Curated annotation (Swiss-Prot):
Compartments, record wording: Cytoplasm
Gene name tied to this protein: thrS
Species, as recorded: Alteromonas mediterranea (strain DSM 17117 / CIP 110805 / LMG 28347 / Deep ecotype)
The keyword tRNA-binding is annotated on this UniProt entry: yes
Name of this protein: Threonine--tRNA ligase
Enzyme Commission number, as recorded: 6.1.1.3
Amino acid sequence: MPVITLPDGSQRAFDNPVSVLDVANDIGPGLAKATIAGKVNGELVDAVDMIDADAQLQIITAKDEEGLEILRHSCAHLLGHAIKQLWPNTKMAIGPVIDNGFYYDVDMEESLTQEDLAKLEKRMLELAKTNYNVVKNKVSWQEARDAFEARGESYKMEILDENISKDDRPALYQHEEYTDMCRGPHVPNMKFCHHFKLMKVAGAYWRGDSDNKMLQRIYGTAWADKKQLKSYLQRLEEAEKRDHRKIGKALNLFHWQEEAPGMVFWHNDGWSIYTELESFVRKKLREYGYDEVKGPLMMDRSLWEKSGHWDKYAENMFTTESEKREYAVKPMNCPGHVQIFNQGLKSYRDLPLRMAEFGCCHRNEPSGALHGLMRVRGFTQDDAHIFCTEEQILEEVSGCIKMVYETYAAFGFENIKVKLSTRPEKRVGADEIWDKSEAALAEALKANDIEFDYQPGEGAFYGPKIEFTLHDCLDRAWQCGTVQLDFSMPGRLGSTYVAEDGERKVPVMIHRAILGSLERFIGILTEEFAGFFPLWLAPQQVVVMNITDKQADYASDCVKKLQDLGFRAKSDLRNEKIGFKIREHTLKRIPYMLVVGDKEMEAGEVAVRSRRGDDLGKMGLEDFIAMAQQEVVEKTIK
């Protein structure tokens, strides 16, 4: 007689084993109608799965994050159902859930077009609207293999042969005549899968291996209701308008070339943003007591072997040879900083030692993964390493956390999610060191009243880390900042200090980045502001325009005064209509346009317009300067 305990603590007793759906029905018909799955003792199960012992149960609906993921996974199966009806010879590979949707890799002779996607989406909707039940069957390994062999599903057979034990009982999900294999859970009925859209088709190698066959990957998005789907598609449309690659081209900020994949060509205005951002971070470093250093771009293979990078990270490193020695271009700054620490005897009185670098790093990312400024091969990290004692960890990590939040606030980012990533399978260091590291980071977060989630297995190979993820105006997540403890690398590279008792000890090393990489952060800012950078960051801050040649000298004088005070200002003295000039500079998103005619020249004034189209009226040049200076100092976002 199972006793079911619900999230509110209430209990319900049953005379016989019950399914999740039975319990939902017992609570109320409305809940039963909305039930997608259940979570029994913390484990997700299908709505039809039976509970035969006392258990904790949470009913999962489309309002839950897990429910939305299940719904999306079932839409992937729905895609399989539809594609096999339209193209029966298609071989199905894998169809997992991804952020905001799903995909399915398929092997078929036809190259799918946008028209084919529309036809496939239409058939999916026709099938879903019949509201058929999804039937789950647990079968033996051999029964599953026989089922897929009869259908010629070679990829499913390979998954069974290589990834599933013959002692297991795989779950087969029946969508009318279509059968798929999955760990589940899935929706009990297709009434939950009416709100989806197929987005695009791309190529993908089977198992991500370029030696294998290229498949077609069909991407889709799915949501709980029509309103959510519409909202998501609108966000995508807005994201397309804000694409930093388009804005970068329109504003002449940067470009890329095939001759240097993943490397950025910075133009004058783009580099202005870069250097301003660097200066902002440099000022923060001084406030928080960091020394700024610069390490070499390449170092001998032997150092990377000692640090552990050669063993764990070699495939991502660019290498070269000279005079029979092998070198690696640095993918990270940490080993170089350890070398600087190791110069000269260090005492406990020298700790904490905070070392920062705008370090130029290179990583051999796959060409298919490169994406504008967001995923590059050459980038600059706002990297820092703090060498400290174990007793100083809490205070130092707390300082890093405070610095992260202050920096993000300057750009208007307030929605920040924090995760603590713990030990991965491939790692260096003993388990007791990892225990100590993970506990120290968790303690620092709790001490600063920071809510966080654990990410098991997602830490770097040398230590656990705190990850700070920004959410932008389109609610997209960008993981930028990290604070990472490392009890391993200093010891591996021979770092010691003289403790208070005269003994030699190995310092703790804290890896810290706030922006992550300057390139990627500029990409994020470009899309966040849609190119309307705040005044302090804008590459061109002010343009002064004359109406006729008569005011050219006055306009030039205004520009010189602005430039002398540090403003990035220029004049536009072309013999063009003022309306034409205003439109042109508005499109360039220059924050302020100052128009000078005879009246303004005689009164020593300027007529001020903003890039948003606001006419701010006439004011003395000194008054405008005071207003603009305040905006720069306060880092106002408009």
